[in-house]
């Protein structure tokens, strides 16, 4: 997933000899991080404490934790600004659930705070094997579209796990809706969902032009330079 991807990206940047990235962890529910986060939301807000004290469910606790942390996020921006001349990259690891970060008030505060001070790019990490089926691919593209629409920032679409499932066909589907339609026909699915996917492929054609798709593998390290150059 995304945390493994950030671990690989962090290791790749260290190996290249660039200045170590400044990593900010904004996932309050993660148990262990395989990298050193310079700023960690878990040091300020207890995810499980919120669940117990306020009777919240998992997603509610994550949203509340991010919202609370966002009230003092100017301090994080100040830390990054002080190190700006020394840093090449600031990497922010957010909660994986799109709805609890991208569409939360706290998530908006964080995104806008970074975008107002730094050149900011959103990375949407999609699972390449999970996108192998046309309808699953379309579901992922709709999610990416919603994130791009909300953030209004440049986006890199990283198809992860290409060592297990090459992303070449996914790029073909993005480049030519007729190829995507042929894949839908070959699947034999005549459901309403398949018909909707067919229509959406036409609607999203312009959206694809605003994405920078790359294939990566967090497991074996493929595509990291392509990702950084996207």
Please state what every model-predicted region is.
Residues 112-230:
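Conserved GTP-binding G-domain of TRAFAC-class P-loop NTPases and closely related GTPase folds
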Residues 1:
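Conserved glycine(s) of the Walker
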Residues 4-121:
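Nucleotide-state-sensitive switch-loop elements of NTP-binding domains
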């Amino acid at each position: 997933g995304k945390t493994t991807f950030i671990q690989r990206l962090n290791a790749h940047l260290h190996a290249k000899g660039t200045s170590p990235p400044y990593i900010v962890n904004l996932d309050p529910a993660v148990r262990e991080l395989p990298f050193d986060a310079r700023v960690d939301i878990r040091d300020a807000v207890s995810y499980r404490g919120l669940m117990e004290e306020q009777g919240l469910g998992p997603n509610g606790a994550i949203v509340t934790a991010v919202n609370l942390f966002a009230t003092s996020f100017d301090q994080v921006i100040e830390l990054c600004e002080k190190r700006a001349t020394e840093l090449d990259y600031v990497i922010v690891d957010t909660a994986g659930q799109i709805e609890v970060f991208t569409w939360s008030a706290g998530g908006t505060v964080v995104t806008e705070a970074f975008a107002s001070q730094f050149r900011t790019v959103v990375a949407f990490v999609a699972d390449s094997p999970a996108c192998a089926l046309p309808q699953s691919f379309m579901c992922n593209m709709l999610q990416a579209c919603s994130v791009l629409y909300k953030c209004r920032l440049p986006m890199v679409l990283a198809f992860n796990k290409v060592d297990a499932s090459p992303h070449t066909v996914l790029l073909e589907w993005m480049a030519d809706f007729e190829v995507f339609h042929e894949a839908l026909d070959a699947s034999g699915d005549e459901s309403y969902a398949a018909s909707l996917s067919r229509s959406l492929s036409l609607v999203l054609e312009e959206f694809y032009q605003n994405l920078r798709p790359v294939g990566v593998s967090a497991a074996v390290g493929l595509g990291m330079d392509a990702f950084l150059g996207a």
